[in-house]
């Protein structure tokens, strides 16, 4: 059963589990569980997608309860009226506040993007980050005898595919557990020493104007058990 974070007569938001596809996809034709279908069965009515989260990413995922509301909300996303914030655990010490303004060329997936144009120019991509916590762990990762990590807040300003993951790789602080853009040695160290295998990227907050009431709505999502375990092992509290 999905954790419902917000629900009214027009919208419903859930805390998407890591590893779960938002909807049926040829990315994995053998998968049988999807957020959309599970939520539909759970609340007893159809839901309409507004935005998406990558399969390995957890956190706030918003759906509309009608196609009309979905269209109104999609306009807010397109016009950048929606504010999103993420938490990520990254390699190394990343402190302070900075903006990453680095255009990204779409990395086409052989399956998901099989019909997409291959020669697209790099697209504008902007991410703000803020370092929140740091830690050094007494086990080796690659050529280093210790492993350093940072907890960071990430705020995307453009909706590019894998933008946060690609931007963190660009600044040499890849997200822990990222099998596509991450550090293989760091991922192995996390798994062997801490038993952590997921992508440590979590959509913790989503703010928007309600399409009917015009109220400012902010929805937050708590961390799952594996995140909580990692935070405890790193001694990161009161985040």
Curated annotation (Swiss-Prot):
Pfam annotation, one family? PseudoU_synth_2
Tell me if tRNA processing is a UniProt keyword of this record: yes
GO terms under biological process: enzyme-directed rRNA pseudouridine synthesis; tRNA processing
Reactions catalysed according to its record: uridine(65) in tRNA = pseudouridine(65) in tRNA
Cysteine pairs forming cystine bridges in this chain are: none
InterPro entries referenced in this protein's UniProt entry, alphabetically: PsdUridine_synth_cat_dom_sf (IPR020103), PsdUridine_synth_RluA-like_CS (IPR006224), PsdUridine_synth_RsuA/RluA (IPR006145), RluA_PseudoU_synthase (IPR050188)
What keywords does the record list, in alphabetical order? Isomerase, tRNA processing
**E.C. number(s) listed in UniProt:** 5.4.99.26
Enumerate the GO terms in the molecular function aspect: pseudouridine synthase activity; RNA binding; tRNA pseudouridine(65) synthase activity
Where do the catalytic residues lie? 54
Q: What does this protein do?
A: Responsible for synthesis of pseudouridine from uracil-65 in transfer RNAs.
Q: Which family does it belong to?
A: Belongs to the pseudouridine synthase RluA family.
Protein name per UniProt: tRNA pseudouridine synthase C
């Amino acid at each position: 059963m999905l954790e419902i974070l917000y629900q009214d007569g027009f919208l419903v938001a859930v805390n998407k589990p890591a590893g779960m596809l938002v909807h049926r996809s040829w990315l994995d034709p053998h998968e049988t569980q999807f957020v959309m279908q599970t939520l539909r069965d759970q609340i007893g009515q159809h839901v309409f997608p507004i935005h998406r989260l990558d399969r390995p990413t957890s956190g706030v995922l918003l759906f509309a309860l009608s196609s009309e509301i979905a269209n109104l909300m999609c306009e807010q996303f397109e016009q950048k009226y929606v504010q999103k914030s993420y938490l990520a655990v990254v390699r190394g010490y990343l402190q302070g506040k900075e903006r990453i303004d680095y255009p990204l060329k779409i990395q086409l997936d052989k399956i998901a993007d099989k019909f997409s144009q291959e020669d697209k120019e790099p697209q504008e991509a902007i991410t703000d980050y803020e370092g929140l916590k740091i830690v050094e762990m007494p086990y080796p990762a690659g050529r280093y005898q210790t492993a350093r990590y940072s907890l960071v807040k990430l705020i995307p300003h453009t909706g590019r595919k894998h933008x946060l993951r690609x931007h963190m790789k660009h600044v040499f602080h890849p997200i822990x557990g990222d099998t596509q853009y991450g550090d293989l040695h760091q991922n192995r160290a996390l798994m062997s020493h801490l038993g952590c295998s997921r992508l440590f990227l979590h959509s913790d907050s989503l703010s928007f104007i309600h399409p009917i009431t015009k109220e400012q709505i902010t929805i937050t999502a708590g961390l799952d058990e594996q995140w909580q375990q990692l935070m405890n092992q790193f001694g990161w509290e009161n985040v």
